């Protein structure tokens, strides 16, 4: 079985994890390789360029630059200077604070980009993008470690040239290149599971023949089915016979949109998220914010005097937060490092999602995976998928949150119940729904 992803999005990683943890193994392929694919995930590029899984990421100041040029850097990005002229920008792979090079924009003296080098997790440049003077992309080329050009894509025309095993192959459409890859890969093509109606669907469609393909739908739906989904339900595909929806509300909407005869093709399976630890009902509260606008914080810190509040920020803190930090049960962590944040996630058993402004570093998901009790006000909810409705309180009555918490002794049981309500499907459900497609 093949799992086919167009991009390595968080949704793709979640599906990969859910299937692996359910014991449903297969080959995961990403069509667009950023050079930092996790172990066990491959791409057409790694196949044709015969990438050796050897080496380590390139640290930003190890980049080779012309003699007497200088490299400077922050935890956001690096820069390359020729005296007072900036000649390059170094972009880091996530997490940025590690400063591993993902790409380097090379600049003309006027600051425009003429070329971007793309680095992989083994520390060498595996691709290069070329730009016209108007900053439009012209070509992207892929190389072996020794620098031999293997693949060249004309972005404007869509033409692809592949130099492989002593022959040059010309493809006028990208889908034809991918079909060539699958036919040469030696992989079992009897079942392809994909999560996009873009290129992965086209590959399934044009590959033809008999197959047991599945579309995993991880997006929202409008009031009309997408065109390629209509093709699936009309029976015009020889391979895709099942659609798995991973959001319950979208699942219900899809059932409403399709004809009665097609409903049997549709099933629901939520994502299965990691559970990295248990909740120990400690009175340790975590808040992560880059804003001093924290809903109800005065009321909460006063009413929950027996609880310790750990308030962290990736930035410096305003006088307003510094004043809150004067309270005996409040500890502040300005300019907090990601490592400190992870340490606090292990130390705390309650996460208050009560900061206004943007969510910081997917903190709500990180808290959910570590079984923290997640509470919020109705005007501060971030990442609502991880919030149970029972843990969301009226912001005009901030004391209701603290009153509720004071009456709760066993956080672990509540967290377990909420998790089951939000994501009821288990590994057993995955096998039950999918087993006929992996036999």
UniProtKB/Swiss-Prot annotation:
Protein name per its UniProtKB record: UDP-N-acetylglucosamine--peptide N-acetylglucosaminyltransferase stabilizing protein GtfB
A GO CC term assigned to this protein in UniProt: protein N-acetylglucosaminyltransferase complex
Family: Belongs to the GtfB family.
The keyword Secreted is annotated on this UniProt entry: no
One GO process term, biological-process aspect: regulation of protein stability
Function: Required for the polymorphic O-glycosylation of the serine-rich repeat protein Fap1. A stabilizing protein that is part of the accessory SecA2/SecY2 system specifically required to export Fap1, a serine-rich fimbrial adhesin encoded upstream in the same operon. The GtfA-GtfB (Gtf1-Gtf2 in this bacteria) complex adds GlcNAc from UDP-GlcNAc to Fap1, attaching the first sugar residue. Cannot use not UDP-Glc as substrate. Stabilizes the glycosylation activity of GtfA, causing it to partially localize to the cellular membrane where it is more protease resistant.
Main location: membrane
Organism: Streptococcus parasanguinis
Knockout mutant characteristics: No glycosylation of serine-rich fimbrial adhesin Fap1. The unglycosylated version of Fap1 accumulates which is larger than the wild-type protein. In a deletion mutant, GtfA (Gtf1) is less stable in vivo, no longer associates with the cell membrane and has an increased protease susceptibility. Biofilm formation decreases. In a double gftA/gtfB (gtf1/gtf2) mutant, there is no further affect on glycosylation but biofilm formation is further decreased.
HAMAP family: GtfB
Keywords: Cell membrane, Membrane
Pathway: Protein modification; protein glycosylation
